[in-house]
From Swiss-Prot:
Gene that encodes it: fadI
Keyword Lipid metabolism in annotation: yes
Protein name: 3-ketoacyl-CoA thiolase
Lineage summary: Bacteria, Pseudomonadati, Pseudomonadota, Gammaproteobacteria, Enterobacterales
Sample GO molecular function, one term: acetyl-CoA C-acyltransferase activity
The keyword Glycoprotein belongs to this UniProt entry's keyword annotation: no
Pathway this chain belongs to: Lipid metabolism; fatty acid beta-oxidation
Active site: C99 (acyl-thioester intermediate), H392 (proton acceptor), C422 (proton acceptor)
Organism, as annotated: Escherichia coli (strain 55989 / EAEC)
Reaction(s) catalysed (UniProt annotation): an acyl-CoA + acetyl-CoA = a 3-oxoacyl-CoA + CoA
EC nos: 2.3.1.16
GO biological process: fatty acid beta-oxidation
């Protein structure tokens, strides 16, 4: 066991997570169509503060993230402060770590708490795949800049004459890695082939995710952590996530064609997480500040770790790299965990990480560790389903996982929970949570 790194303030306070909330998650182009991420962020933070009954002036910092950023609101965190009635003097800044963005936001607020610069803060993230920054071609962009500087109409017309019809076509946001040109699904296909993960295994995991998420909603387990969203024109509220397929069968999954490697692939739209709109946030405080306010924490942040690997091959192995580091810093092993919640970007990615967490060879030859991190106990793993079912608004997923895991730990009488995710750029994130 390596060095344990206690997450405490200078006064010995633990980092308490006192509350968490999210919007329902909606598939791209459905319930939240036309609602930008900044409005989703305002929606969830405003409701979180109202439900917690914590005076707005108590919150000293807000760290929020957005992956698909809109040019008109580059600092989503500050816009949320200004749009929710929070104290205008509240420190607010934005972060981005791809699919681990709200993990980063939580870590940043925790670090401010440990440094003693604040005693309470909000962390979270929001993304919209329905309101996108549709751009223009590089040639058109250059001409528009030059036209703005031109002094005469003839100069402007001469500049516009350089353009062709193809230069006027809108340019959608990139879906591939900037460094490699690979799409996430291409990497998932790599991983399926590298680790021998079959189409049947992927479909089975996806089906499990949807069944468990549907059961969680049916049992009322999510009602305290998901707000009702009232969407213009306010005729019909969104109460639950609208991606979950509770009545599907394995035979339904088998009907879909591969989405990335059309000829030999196994990754489909059904065994991948969909493009999604939504927002989520958590309130963090020092343990003593929570006691002063008479608040009972949902739980505590025990440790966290971020890692990075090469992006050319199997880059979605973040959980296999970050989990052993987070456990080491918490002074725990896999067997100490009550729950394990892993982000399901793709079923192939999830199954590959599970495989490597239990691999002695991977531990020795790749991580340089003496032993495997540990086998993943299926009875502890994604017990309420995962991102394949709920959806994945990139910057919101981490906060969803944290809140969901802490509530489930309480239902089980407390214990330790691991939340972990892969992210674009070969990044990984893991956090160990504790509930009493």
């Amino acid at each position: 066991m390596g060095q344990v790194l206690p997450l405490v303030t200078r006064q010995g306070d633990r980092i308490a997570i006192v509350s968490g909330l999210r919007t329902p998650f909606a598939r791209q182009g459905t319930a939240f169509h036309g609602i930008p991420a900044v409005d989703l962020g305002k929606m969830v933070v405003g409701e979180l503060l109202a439900r917690s009954e914590i005076p707005a002036e108590v919150i000293e910092q807000l760290v929020f993230g957005q992956v698909v950023q809109m040019p008109e609101a580059p600092n989503i965190a500050r816009e949320i402060v200004l749009g929710t009635g929070m104290n205008v003097h509240t420190d607010a800044y934005s972060v981005s770590r791809a699919c681990a963005t709200s993990f980063q936001a939580v870590a940043n607020v925790a670090e401010s708490l440990m440094a003693g610069t604040i005693r309470a803060g909000i962390a979270g993230g929001a993304d919209s795949s329905s309101v996108l920054p549709i751009g223009v071609s590089k040639k058109l962009a250059r001409v528009l800049v030059d036209v703005n500087k031109a002094r005469t109409m003839s100069q402007r017309l001469k500049l516009f004459s350089r353009l062709r019809l193809r230069d006027l076509m809108p340019v959608p946001p990139a879906v591939a890695e900037y460094s490699t040109g690979l799409r996430m699904g291409d990497t998932a296909e790599q991983m399926a082939k590298t680790y021998g993960i079959t189409r049947e295994q992927q479909d089975a995991l996806a089906h499990r995710s949807h069944q468990r998420a549907a059961q969680a909603w049916s049992d009322g387990k999510l009602k305290e952590e998901v707000m009702t969203a009232f969407i213009p024109p306010y005729k019909q509220p969104l109460v639950e996530d609208n991606n979950i397929r509770g009545n599907s069968s394995l035979a339904d999954y088998a009907k879909l064609r591969p989405a990335f490697d059309r000829k030999h692939g196994t990754v489909t739209a059904a065994n991948s997480t969909p493009l999604t709109d939504g927002a989520a946030a958590v309130i963090l405080m020092t343990e003593s500040r929570a006691k002063e306010l008479g608040l009972v924490p949902l739980g505590y942040l025990r440790s966290y770790a971020f890692t990075a690997i090469d992006v050319w091959q199997d880059m979605l192995l973040g959980p296999a790299w970050s989990t052993p580091l987070a456990l080491e810093r918490a002074g725990l092993t896999m067997s100490d965990l009550t729950l394990i919640d892993m982000h399901e970007a793709f079923a192939a990615q999830t199954l590959a990480n599970i495989q490597l967490l239990g691999s002695e060879r991977f531990a020795r030859e790749v991580l340089g560790r003496a032993h495997a991190t540990g086998e993943v106990d299926d009875s502890k793993f994604n017990v309420l389903g995962g991102s394949i079912a709920y959806g994945h608004p990139f910057a919101a997923t981490g906060a969803r996982m944290i809140t969901q895991t802490l509530h489930e730990l309480h239902r089980r009488g407390g214990g330790f929970g691991l939340v972990t995710a892969c992210a674009a750029g070969g990044l990984g994130a893991a956090m160990v949570l504790e509930a009493e």
